[in-house]
């Protein structure tokens, strides 16, 4: 029982994860005569408990407060693209905790090498159970999305055949989906993260593209536009960075606007200039205006000069 509790706390669902987390304990259990059955039973029980009693935030939010978040790769990607990391982090946290109602999806949009897959992959791998949408199989695209903590839709497209089920899943509604070689199964409200460089709000119907579902789809998403390419040595986002980012978000929550486009901003304000930087105001150059002569005075002077000429 103690072993199962430890596996649940660590989010371990396979022998590989167990070895990576604590090799010594795995070897000690594997040395017993009936070790194989014990290990399998412990992992099965832990998996059932996690799927029934745990949610994504239980594994995404770290336990320890984070003092310096500036070196976190998720923080860097968001800041590089002009987003306020604190506001964006609050969007991610609210998304994971299903706080925003039917706006249940984060869409990371942008070209290759901008970090969208880097972020989504790290978040998906941090939770014990995540499902991937297989959009190439229109008959069973959501076959892998049942009983998951996070659903990841990678580089997909929206087709007329799946759009209604997709709207329900993206909006966090319960929906039954067909499964291959099985009866239909229910997908419970699950946070969805989408990564693509195509318009996920345009529905492809054969050779035509329609936009009749654009507004309903936008009402179910937060869209981040990642356009800045990362350096070749930027590196992969780690599980610990994911946990640190969500923990920092929890400790610095701000109010989030329910809008399709996540607002940008948060640029650092320029400091006020010091006294040394303030130069003395330039002195205004004073000019002495010459006295002007009115028209009446000019005519009198002309008449006077004319009279003097005649007298001479």
From Swiss-Prot:
Q: Tell me the compartments it is located in.
A: Host nucleus
Q: GO molecular-function annotation terms?
A: ATP binding; ATP hydrolysis activity
In this chain, the stretch annotated as Disordered covers 264-301
Q: What class of enzyme is it?
A: hydrolase
Q: What do the Gene Ontology cellular component annotations say?
A: host cell nucleus
Gene that this sequence comes from: Rep40
Q: Which domain of life is it from?
A: Viruses
The entry's protein name is Protein Rep40
Enzyme Commission number(s) from the entry: 3.6.4.12
Which GO terms are recorded in the biological process aspect for this UniProt protein?
A: DNA replication; viral genome replication
Sorted keywords for this record are: ATP-binding, DNA replication, Host nucleus, Hydrolase, Nucleotide-binding
Instruction: Report the InterPro entries cross-referenced here.
Output: Helicase_SF3_DNA-vir, P-loop_NTPase, Parvovirus_NS1_helicase
Domain SF3 helicase positions: 84-239
Q: Which residues bind ATP?
A: 110-117
Give the record's subunit note: Homooligomer.
Q: What is its main location?
A: host cell
| Catalytic reactions on record | ATP + H2O = ADP + phosphate + H(+)
Task: Give the protein's biological function.
Answer: Plays a critical role during packaging of viral DNA into empty capsids, where they are thought to be part of the packaging motor complex. The single stranded genomic DNA is packaged in a 3' to 5' direction and requires the association of viral DNA with Rep40.
């Amino acid at each position: 029982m103690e072993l199962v509790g430890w596996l649940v706390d660590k989010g371990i669902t396979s022998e590989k994860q167990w070895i990576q987390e604590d090799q010594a304990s795995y070897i000690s259990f594997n040395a017993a005569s009936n070790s194989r059955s014990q290990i399998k039973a412990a992992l099965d029980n832990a998996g059932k408990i996690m799927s029934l009693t745990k949610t994504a935030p239980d594994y995404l939010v770290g336990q320890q407060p984070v003092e310096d978040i500036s070196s976190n790769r998720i923080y860097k990607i968001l800041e590089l693209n002009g987003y306020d990391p604190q506001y964006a982090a609050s969007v991610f946290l609210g998304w994971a905790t299903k706080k925003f109602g039917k706006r249940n999806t984060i869409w990371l949009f942008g070209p290759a090498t901008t970090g969208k897959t880097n972020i989504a992959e790290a978040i998906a791998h941090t939770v014990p159970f995540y499902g991937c949408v297989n959009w190439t199989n229109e008959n069973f695209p959501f076959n892998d999305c049942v009983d998951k903590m996070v659903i990841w839709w990678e580089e997909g497209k929206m087709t007329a055949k799946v759009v209604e089920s997709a709207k329900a899943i993206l909006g966090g509604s319960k929906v039954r989906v067909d499964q291959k070689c099985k009866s239909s199964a229910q997908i419970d409200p699950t946070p969805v993260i989408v990564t693509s460089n195509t318009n996920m709000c345009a529905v492809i119907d054969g050779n035509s593209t329609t936009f009749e579902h654009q507004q309903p789809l936008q009402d179910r998403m937060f869209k981040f536009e990642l356009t800045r390419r990362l350096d070749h040595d930027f590196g992969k986002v780690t599980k610990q960075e994911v946990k640190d980012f969500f923990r920092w978000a929890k400790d610095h929550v701000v109010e989030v606007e329910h809008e399709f486009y996540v607002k940008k901003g948060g640029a650092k304000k320029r400091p006020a200039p010091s006294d040394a930087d303030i130069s003395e105001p330039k002195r205004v150059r004073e000019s002495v205006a010459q006295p002007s002569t009115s028209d009446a005075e000019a005519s009198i002077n002309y008449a006077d000069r004319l009279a003097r000429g005649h007298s001479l």
